[in-house]
């Protein structure tokens, strides 16, 4: 596996080592099983979440003592610092607890220069996502590209939604005010397929490396999206809110695409939010015509 130079990636490389250590810890818990506690309708936490967050917090303090840490499981340290890490020590806890092998460690670094208003976002400058069961390490630093196990990655070139594999997630609160089932149905009918695997950070990483062309979800938190949002943009993709406005850490919604199907997805969102009848599902002949027209444009 090619190794990235720590002098060129001063934030991501040390964070990657921490993510690997946390991932090894999670893997050990996964192999022996854990007990889950409910903290909402379906949202759970395990001893593995807490142990991973504790380890990450301790390692970050040792390597970056001036940095703040904001963790899903309650860690709040030096939040007035110029640099702030958003960490999800175990994204995909429900999967983990059930033995479903789709989860990760996610760490995103926000830079907040002096004078940044309290209620304004800084800039995400580094992101690390590690899948321990697959031993896949995604990293990015702003302006330097995105990488999977040391090799640069790019979003998929697919130009049409009908040929795209996309993903989504469902809120961890059963009574969330914007249920996603209607959107899931419409996008399933208009894409090559929709996947719902249960770990937003992994889904964003998969958009970045071209395994998915798009991903959308409601009710997310900064620790879910900080790392993945940078991976997507550094891999050449696009990340916005559903209406096309800029994505912010506290947006609570995300639409990440390869940059080619985003407009088509946003148009569908606009129609569905407005209660308008969406266009009929194209016939096979219409699908072929669209495909031929797209191919002609690329020539």
Label for each model-derived stretch:
Residues 79-149, 162:
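DPxDG-like acidic metal-binding loop motif
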Residues 15, 19-22, 52, 127, ...:
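Small-residue (primarily alanine) positions within well-ordered alpha-helices
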Residues 50, 54, 73, 89-92, ...:
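Generic detector of well-ordered alpha-helical packing
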């Amino acid at each position: 596996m090619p190794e990235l130079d720590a002098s060129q990636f001063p934030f991501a490389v040390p964070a990657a080592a921490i993510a690997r250590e946390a991932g090894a810890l999670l893997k050990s818990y996964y192999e022996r099983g854990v007990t889950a506690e409910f903290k909402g309708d379906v949202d759970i936490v395990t001893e593995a979440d807490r142990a991973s967050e504790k380890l990450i917090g301790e390692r970050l303090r040792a390597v970056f003592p001036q940095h703040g840490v904001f963790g899903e499981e309650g860690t709040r340290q030096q939040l007035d610092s110029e640099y702030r890490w958003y960490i999800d020590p175990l994204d995909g806890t429900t999967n983990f607890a059930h033995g479903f092998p789709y989860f990760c460690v996610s760490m995103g670094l926000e830079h907040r220069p002096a004078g940044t208003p309290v209620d304004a976002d800084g800039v995400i400058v580094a992101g690390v996502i590690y899948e321990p069961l697959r031993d896949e390490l995604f990293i990015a630093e702003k302006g330097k590209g995105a990488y999977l196990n040391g090799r640069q990655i790019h979003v998929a070139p697919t130009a049409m939604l009908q040929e795209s594999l996309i993903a989504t997630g469902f809120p961890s609160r059963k009574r969330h005010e914007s249920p996603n089932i209607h959107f899931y149905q419409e996008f399933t009918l208009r894409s090559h397929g929709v996947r719902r695997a249960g770990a937003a950070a992994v889904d964003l990483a998969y958009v970045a490396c071209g395994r998915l062309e798009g991903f959308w979800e409601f009710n997310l938190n900064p620790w879910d999206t900080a790392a993945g949002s940078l991976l997507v943009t550094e891999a050449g993709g696009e990340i916005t809110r559903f209406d096309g406005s800029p994505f912010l850490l506290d947006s609570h919604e995300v639409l990440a695409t390869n940059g080619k199907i985003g407009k088509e997805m946003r148009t569908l969102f606009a129609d569905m939010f407005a209660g308008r009848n969406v266009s009929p599902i194209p016939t096979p002949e219409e699908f072929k015509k669209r495909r031929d027209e797209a191919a002609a444009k690329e020539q």
